[in-house]
Amino acid sequence: RHARLMSARPEKGPGQFKREVNRAGQTVFVDPGHVEGTLRQGFELYLSLETAFARAVYMMFLVSEVHPFADGNGRIARVMANAELVAAGEERILVPTVYRANYLSALKALSQAQDPGPIVRVLDFAQRWVAATPWMDLEGTRVALERNHAFMDANEAENAGIRLRLP
C-alpha cells in the first residue's frame, strides 16, 4: 500500500522501510534496524483484536508509532485503518483539518502516557462524523463540511472555541 501511495515520489523509497531514524519534534521513532521486528510483534497483537474498529485504531497507532517509512507514515496509517473498516463493511474514518490537533494529541496520549481512551474517543467521533456527513453531491458535501467547521485551521478553531460538529 505504501508503494502505491507514494509512487509519485520515488525519492521517498515507496514501499521500502526507512534507512535512517526519523523524528517529529522531540519524538524519535523506532530505529530502522528494529522496524520489521517491531511490526511483526505488533501484528501478533493485531491478530487477537476482535472488532474492525479495534483493529483500525490499533493499526493506525502501530504505523504512527513505528513510523516505518521515510515519508507518508500518517497517510499510510490512515489507509491501513480504513482498510480494516472497509473490509468489515464499516464506515471509514476521516480526520478533517479542524480535528487534526485532537487526533495528534490523542496519539500522543497513547504513545507517551499509555492511555488509549483519547484515541478511541477521537476516532469514534471521526467515524460517526463521516457516517453523518452527506457525501452524495459535491455542493451539498461542501456546504455541510463548511457548516460543521471541517475546513477550519485547528489552531484558529481552538482559539475561537470552535469544534468539529456532527451534521
Model-found features: residue ranges?
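FIC/Doc superfamily catalytic core
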Residues: R1-P167
